[in-house]
C-alpha cells in the first residue's frame, strides 16, 4: 500500500513540475528549467493572483558571494520589470557559489491580481553574481489568465 502511495506521489510530482523549453540568453549555464503546471513547448498558463513556481538547474560560471534575481516580462511587446519579487537569490539557494559547480534554485512568487491578461508573454529570468550574469533563460510560450 505504501509503495502505491509513493508511486502515485512521484507521478503527481512529475506531472506538476515538468521541464519547459527555454532559450539560453547567456553561455549555456542553464541545464534545466521546471515550472509548475507547464510542459515542454506547450503554452505556460500563469494565473493572476496565484503563486507561480520556477525551478532551475544551472552551472555557476563564476565564484560569487551574492546572487541577484532579475525577472522581466514582455506583455504583447511591452517589457516591464516584474514587481513584488525578492531579488536576493541567496534566499532560495545556498550562497556563496563556486565556479563550475551545479546549483538548484527554486523560486515562488505570487502573480499580482492586477497583472494584465495577455496571450503573448515572454519572461526573461537572469541570475546576476558579483562578476556579471550567472545564468539567463527566456521562456517564450506564456499566457496570463484569471
Curated annotation (Swiss-Prot):
Main location: secreted
Database matches in Pfam families: E1_DerP2_DerF2
Cystine bridges: 25-136, 38-44, 90-95
Residue intervals passing through the bilayer: none
SMART domains: ML
Compartmental location: Secreted
GO terms under biological process: sterol transport
Signal peptide: 1-17
Any one Gene Ontology molecular-function term assigned to this protein's record: sterol binding
Keywords: Allergen, Disulfide bond, Secreted, Signal
Cited Gene3D superfamilies: 2.60.40.770
GO CC terms, sorted: extracellular region
InterPro entries: Ig_E-set, ML_dom, NPC2-like
Protein family per UniProt: Belongs to the NPC2 family.
Note: The sequence shown here is from clone 2. The N-terminal sequence (AA 1-8) from clone 1 and 11 are not yet known.
PANTHER family named in the record: NIEMANN PICK TYPE C2 PROTEIN NPC2-RELATED (PTHR11306), NPC INTRACELLULAR CHOLESTEROL TRANSPORTER 2 (PTHR11306:SF68)
The protein, known as: Mite group 2 allergen Der f 2
Organism for this UniProt entry: Dermatophagoides farinae (American house dust mite)
